[in-house]
Amino acid sequence: DREGSLVIWTTTPWTIPANTFVAVDGEMTYQAVRAAQDGDSETLYIAEPCVKDVLKKGRYDDYEVVEEYTGEELVGWEYDHPLADRLAETADFAGAGEVYTAEYVEADRTGLVHSAPGHGQEDFARGKELGLETFVPVDGRGEFTGTAGDYAGTFVRDANDDIIADLDDVGALLASGTHDHRYGHCWRCDTDIIFLATDQWFITVTDIKDDLLDNIDDSEW
């Protein structure tokens, strides 16, 4: 068991209930930092290029680097979901709740990325590569299901503030703020898209094209 917290970041707090793994850059250097604030101290794991900026945002008074690791050395570390007490279920299956490498991690924010394969294309693809199940506590209406516990029945975007407040309440929020960035919107209704993995089926038409053409004359239109 290790003391401390993996400092992750996300622009979509509503996806945190679906967290399945934390992604790091395998070649990046990460530091275990003992950070002090108002007489108390805690150990935080942050990418080395991000340490000063992160601690500034967290309003820490002072810090010391306790140890350094490569991202590869963090792989396999297990962690507890910060909102487990608020949720009826979390991603609780083989491989979930661990650290993995991913190509989409960059040396910005904290260098550790919250990943929810049920709610993001890159996360989904990496989850499939890792053989992880896809955990989706959201229904087709964009509302949290009963598995989301305290947030059940809430439209996901309306839950952002509550999730941030709950993270703060359990002592798991380092900082929060607004951030301008590009995000997909529906071209019809001009609303931001909710990424949601769903069960679907597809037909490879090229495999049956000849049969389709042969049966045109026998079809009623």
State what each model feature region is.
Residues 1-17, 36-37, 76, 108-221:
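Residue patterns forming the tRNA-binding/recognition surfaces of aminoacyl-tRNA synthetases
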Residues 18-139, 221:
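Catalytic alpha/beta core of large soluble enzyme barrels
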